Design a protein with these regions (language model features):
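Alpha/propeptide regions of enzymes that mature by internal proteolysis
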Residues: 1-499
Length: 499
């Protein structure tokens, strides 16, 4: 009975997620089997735990942040406790979150700001939870609490102290984040391996620290672990809400004060949703010969123009629509659905028609969320994640997220091209992306099936995970769906092929 009551609170979508643990010049030579076994086990565990949260009714935002918080406590990854050192021997962490939804009313939390980030974080155990608090702080007063509550990117000591004092986030001393392998990596990069070892570092803070006697981490014989360990999670909950959460320690021996792509909206993370029309695969931007079509025809063919005209007309009246009467315009106008999270239904199907062909125009909601990992400066230069979203949103017909990712993050994609003749020499341009795409399309006369009692039953709607990378490997964990049977299988991979 309790299970039935819990299930009644779930929505019409089948939850899913995808995680990443970094991307870069990975190979079997620098990723021995014993180290890969550790990565495989940890990613498998975090994937299963987060999926269980989603299946039990957790929101996408809560689930994504929970997954990343687990990764932040794992020294395998370049975030939280496994963060790399700056050239000054300090640690400066970054994190970001962003949300969107196929529900026109938006997700239950974070929809006012949509995205938030923190940077130059030194002593907060979970930077991702600090970013989450920055995101949702505007929800408390509906965005009317003043300028200071609407900032989307905060950095440094002040935001940390706010998190500790007002949000009860956990504070840790500097040395809690230090790990021997990251320190040795830092010293090798400065060509100062033996001048000041990890024991010297710890003893300088606390001569009696237990960190002087490292516990067995099961990695005997492994000299170093990959530094390209930025982590991310993209989740979709049962209500069609998407959330992306990303966290990193940055680049090894980076300049102190450097801001990377992880807290830069559009570069290392992005989430977006929009309304779009489908025209039975007829391209709306096809050029026409002869006389120019009337405005109403252009509106019907161009979704972006249609949205601009209808939204402006809704605000200022039919005087802005000289080509049609108010009655004629009604067929293009949809009432704004009430933003009720628990009562979400698919957008209503309105009888609208293409004026040039008289064929019905179908309406749908499109949402996607992405997290990137790799050389952050390259992601910033090409605004990687938002560019992928733009391809999906502005091209017609809208390509799948996986195809748009390939253009930017795939082999010979925009990230790789941005490195020019430095590709393969400096690490520039290397990286990968993960994401989820969901399209909520309501079509007429779709049979959902009938159960044993003769009642109509609906099939759970699904999202699609996507990923791509242009380098040696991308640590990733997701659920692979068999298109024929609909069955799922958890997958944990690093290379294009199985390890």
């Amino acid at each position: 009975m309790a299970h039935r009551e819990k299930a009644s609170h779930l929505g019409p979508f089948k939850p899913t997620l995808i995680l990443h643990g970094g991307a870069g010049a990975l190979s079997r030579a620098n990723l021995p089997s014993e180290l890969w076994t550790r990565y495989h086990a940890s990613l498998s565990r975090y994937l299963a735990v987060t999926r269980e949260l989603l299946n039990s009714g957790s929101t996408a935002l809560d689930a994504a942040c929970h997954a990343v918080a687990l990764l932040e406590d794992d020294v395998l990854y370049n975030c939280g406790r496994g963060s790399v050192f700056t050239e000054r021997g300090t640690i400066e962490m970054e994190a970001s979150v962003m949300v969107c939804s196929v529900d026109p009313g938006g997700p239950p939390a974070g929809s006012i700001k949509r995205g938030a980030a923190v940077s130059l974080i030194r002593n907060t155990r979970h930077p991702i939870l600090l970013a989450k608090e920055v995101l949702v702080t505007a929800d408390e007063d509906g965005g009317m609490g003043g300028t200071s509550t609407m900032h989307c990117h905060l950095s440094g000591r002040d935001v940390e102290e706010w998190g500790w004092a007002e949000k009860a986030l956990e504070k840790k001393p500097d040395h809690w984040f230090w790990t021997q392998r990251r320190w040795e990596e830092h010293r090798r990069g400065l060509h100062q391996q033996s001048s000041y070892n990890f024991a010297d570092l710890i003893a300088s803070v606390d001569p009696l620290s237990e960190q002087l006697h490292q516990e067995d981490d099961g990695l005997d014989g492994v000299r170093e672990i990959p530094s390209q360990g930025t982590v991310g999670a993209v989740c979709m909950d049962s209500w069609g809400n998407l959330a992306v959460a990303t966290s990193t320690g940055g680049l090894t021996n980076k300049k102190a004060g450097r801001i990377g792509d992880t807290p830069t909206a559009g570069s290392g993370f992005w989430a977006e949703s929009w309304d779009e029309d489908t025209y039975n695969n007829r391209a709306p931007f096809r050029s026409t010969q002869g006389a120019q079509p009337p405005l109403v025809t252009l509106v019907g063919r161009m979704p972006v123009l249609y949205q601009l005209v209808t939204q402006t007309s809704n605000l200022l009246g039919s005087c802005l629509s000289p080509t049609e009467s108010d009655e004629e315009h009604q067929q293009y106008r949809a009432e704004a659905p009430a933003p009720a999270y628990t009562a979400y239904k698919s957008p209503p199907l309105l009888p609208r028609y293409d004026t040039s062909t008289q064929q019905p125009i179908r309406h749908r909601r499109h949402a996607l969320a992405m997290s990137g990992t790799g050389n952050g400066d390259s992601f910033i230069r090409v605004n990687a994640c938002r560019t992928v979203a733009s391809i999906c949103r502005l091209d017609y017909p809208s390509p799948p997220l996986a195809e748009a990712m390939r253009v930017i993050a795939g082999p010979k994609g925009e990230l790789q091209r941005s490195a020019g003749d430095r590709w393969g020499k400096t690490g520039e341009g290397q990286g990968g992306m993960i994401g989820i795409e969901v399209i909520d399309e309501q079509e007429p006369d779709v049979e959902c099936g009938v159960d044993s009692k003769g009642e109509t039953k609906s099939k759970k709607k699904t999202g699609r995970v996507a990923f791509d990378f242009n380098c040696g490997g991308l640590f990733r964990a997701y659920y692979e769906v068999d298109e024929k049977t609909g069955t799922e299988e958890p997958k944990v991979m690093v290379f294009k092929e199985e390890y």
